[in-house]
A protein has these predicted regions:
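Short, hydrophobic secondary-structure boundary micro-motifs
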Residues: 25-27, 56, 175
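Acyl-donor (CoA/ACP) binding surface of acyl/acetyltransferases
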Residues: 1-12, 16-22, 60-182
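A short helix-loop-beta-strand connector motif used in the catalytic cores of GNAT acetyltransferases and
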Residues: 44-58
Length: 182
């Protein structure tokens, strides 16, 4: 598995994923966001942003096939915090790619981008993602009260019940230290 920068050659692969209801419904994507024009606009925005306010990568499987996208968004370099979102082709769920992609992206967030915390907002109806986040040993669950402004922003964006979770730098780096030493 590896993460690579956005480029226009993966437009069809992205559309194949985001056109699926189990992806675009959970992500709250309108039809204009998942057609060719909307997908191209998204990729060009990621390229133009040049990792300033968003750090987004394609997820390639062990055979270098596109299987999803992972993004650090709303990067706040003053408060050293961002929000992470990810999606993977449904037929690749349960194969460990989401965890591997998150681990790699969190490593980048904490060691290269100097962030101190990464938030995950998960819709309560997204049981699969809720359970996946509960399994992550470095995640602190249900922290909306610690980040009221960010929780309000997320609530407005999602317009439905959600849970705000966080990964703190020290927790993740300790997880890596223990994992690498075992």
């Amino acid at each position: 598995m590896r993460l690579i920068k956005h480029d226009l050659s993966y437009i069809d692969a992205i559309m194949a994923g985001t056109s699926r209801p189990e992806i675009h419904d959970i992500l709250g994507m309108d039809t204009h966001m998942i057609d060719r024009e909307g997908t191209t606009r998204f990729v060009l925005n990621m390229i133009d942003d040049n990792d300033c306010t968003q750090y987004s990568r394609y997820i390639l499987d062990d055979d270098d096939q596109f299987i999803g996208i992972i993004t650090l968004k709303d990067i706040d370099r003053v408060d050293r915090i961002a929000t992470m979102g990810t999606w993977i082709y449904p037929e690749r769920w349960g194969e460990g790619y989401n965890r591997r992609a998150k681990d790699e992206m969190l490593t980048t967030a904490f060691t290269q981008l100097a962030l101190e915390a990464v938030l995950f907002g998960v819709k309560l109806r997204n049981i699969r993602s809720m359970k996946a986040q509960e399994k992550l040993p470095y995640t602190t669950l249900d922290v909306a009260d610690r980040y009221p402004e960010r929780a309000l922003t997320k609530q407005i964006r999602l317009n439905e019940p959600f849970q705000l979770n966080v990964v703190y730098k020290e927790d993740f780096l300790e997880y890596l230290r223990v994992t690498l030493n075992s």
